[in-house]
Amino acid sequence: MPHTTSKGKNVYSVDLMFAYINIFTPKATKINLNDINYDMDAKGWGEGNISVNDVLKNPKKYKDDYDRINNANLKYPIIMDTKGNIFDGVHRYIKLKLLNKKTTKAYIFDDKLLNKFIVNKTGDYNTKLEINEYIELFYKKFIK
């Protein structure tokens, strides 16, 4: 299943972000966790109706999400924009906060680069692309 995230009406392909990172090997930057802009009360987990704080307050009720936080592999950098918004790595971020860590590594993408990962501008993150469409999209945005 394709891995996407959304900000406003823009839906971004996290899979394309991983491909970009693996092919072009940008440097990860050490950042202060306080520079990350994440609302722990924002609804968006599960079916979009629970928050991180809901999960942390009710770990038995939200066992799957709670386990994902605890099992998050901290060796992978977070992917974020220049404003501190996370595009991939929320579970890692939450785990780092719970461990009282102060810093982590992050790939920081500016708006120009992030625009290349947009796969939908209608806010419909259920729209699926076929594998050939992802390959063509990557080629058009990064190779041509």
How would you label these PLM feature ranges?
Residues 102-109:
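Short hydrophobic/aromatic-enriched beta-strand-loop microsegments
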Residues 34-87:
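Short alpha-helix boundary/capping and kink motifs at helix termini
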